[in-house]
């Protein structure tokens, strides 16, 4: 009986403890199972017998199993040494639940066998690992060590792209796993590898070094209209005609100074009523363009100028525009005309460029020099030809010529002045 039980134990299981028990029983020595069951009884020794161990395990089955008890030829481990039963009543066993001994023939399949193969015991022992786990496929491969997994009722995780063992190796198929960053063979990988475990909506993690052919086709949404980058025309048709030859007198009348508002798109060279009328008449008014007259369109003003630049400066006086700013430190004054700004800058620099030939006095303005020369009783020589002429309030630096339109003298109280003294003072414009 004992030999059959031991043979059955060796047959069912291959654990080291079962093999050690069988070896000890063959040599007739003391069994470690027997020694562990008799830890509480110091000083007592009994000869080893298999029947005594089996009977002891059956009697102690009510309280708790021995460290290694045998039931129906199977070994089941237990945790602690036996406690004396005299200190406890039968109603209150040492543990919260008692396990009754086997009363009849039980199905061996109901008990956990000790000697089954590792491939059968792992799913039952590691019951928590059988559930869907994020990293189940990784550590299961290490535990089973080559054992094929169970039936494929558990869904494969989405990152489990390497069902093989060495997932870092480059010898796997092109459709399985990630593409290698460096090709191992001479053949290049395909442009769009389709992963078998992925739905069609997902793209590969490593994009191809060059786009797919359908991306190389020109699409209308990426093409910008070329007229966006076309340079805009500088002038309108009227300006092109005036500069090209259809209206040459118009370009000749403005000269180098340019007309008022001529730089704006859709405008003629001047916005005065006379120029607008000549623009409307076109070629019929070619004779009138020889002596252009630019009049102020402000109601109640009616001033007329021979140059569009003079009219432009005059209109700044009406609008209050002061585009010329003094850049001197802590000054920042603004002026309507450039000659006014130039005179103002001389007050900062203390420059006196006009010199009297009789007494060698120097003045910052030409009109101051002319006034000083009258004290000598002789007509002044005028400003030197090298420097720009200084005018009154109504003239600019580049507008030294007298107006072609006759104007009454601005200072009628001094008619006895010699004509060579200061010819520009007779044509001063009051602005």
UniProtKB/Swiss-Prot annotation:
Protein name: Transcription factor Sp7
Gene3D superfamilies hit by this protein: Classic Zinc Finger (3.30.160.60)
Quaternary structure (record): Interacts with RIOX1; the interaction is direct and inhibits transcription activator activity.
Keyword Coiled coil in annotation: no
Any GO BP annotation: osteoblast differentiation
Entry text on domains: The 9aaTAD motif is a transactivation domain present in a large number of yeast and animal transcription factors.
Composition skew (Gly residues), residue ranges: 166-178
Post-translational modifications reported in the UniProt record: Ubiquitination at leads to proteasomal degradation. SP7 is a short-live protein with an endogenous half-life of approximately 12 hours. Propionylated. Depropionylation at Lys-371 by SIRT7 activates transcription factor activity and positively regulates bone formation by osteoblasts.
Keyword Zinc-finger: yes
Species for this entry: Homo sapiens
Positions carrying N6-propionyllysine: 41, 45, 361, 371
Primary site of residence: nucleus
Residue segments, region Disordered: 30-56, 71-115, 154-260, 367-431
Reported tissue expression: Restricted to bone-derived cell.
